[in-house]
Amino acid sequence: MERTAEQPIIADTSALVSLATETDHNHAPAKDAATKLREANQPIILPSDVLVETINVLGKRSCHETAIKAADALLQPGSQFILVETTSHIQAALKKFKDLSQAVSLTDCIVMAIADHYNTKDIFGFDKQFEEAGYRRLEPSTEWKEAA
C-alpha cells in the first residue's frame, strides 16, 4: 500500500487488537505496518466507534489493564492516531450496511464511510470484507495456517 503524507489510513478494530496483543497471529504485520506509517508521518484516522469496539474486545479477550493501556496509547497527544467523531457518517454507513454482505458489521461500514469521506481506500485492518468491498487492507499473517 503506497501512500502519500496527505493521504490518511483508517483504523479498524482488527489491526488495533492485533497491535495490542503480542500473542495475536497478526501482531507482527500490524506492528510492522504501524512502524512504517509512523516513520512516514502517516496519519491514522481512528473512528470513535472503532476505539470503543477495540477497548471492548481487548477488555474481554485480555483484561481491562490491557484495554486501558491500548486506549492510553491510541489517545496519547502527538500520536499518529487522530480520533474522529462518526455521527455525521452514520447514514452513509447504514446504506453500506444495507447493501453489503451479512458478514459485514456496522462498525466495518462506518470505517468504509470514513474512508470515503477522506477519499482513501486504505484501511489499517485485516478483515477480508474491506477488500471485497473495494478497499485495501493489511496483508494478514499466514503463520497460523503454517502452524496448524
Spans of features found by a protein language model:
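Short, well-structured N-terminal submotif of metal-dependent ribonuclease cores
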Residues: 1-46, 59-69, 142-148
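Acidic, PIN/NYN-like endoribonuclease modules and their adjacent C-terminal/linker elements
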Residues: 1-8, 112, 117-148
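Short beta-strand scaffold positions
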Residues: 11, 45-46, 84, 106, ...
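Amphipathic alpha-helical segments within well-ordered protein domains
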Residues: 17, 52-56, 94
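Short active-site oxyanion
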Residues: 40-44, 79-81, 119-121
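Helix-adjacent hinge/juxtasegments
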Residues: 56-84
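Short acidic, glycine/proline-enriched helix-loop-strand junctions
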Residues: 73-87, 99-100, 107, 131-148
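Active-site neighborhoods of divalent-metal-dependent phosphate/nucleic-acid chemistry enzymes
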Residues: 82-122
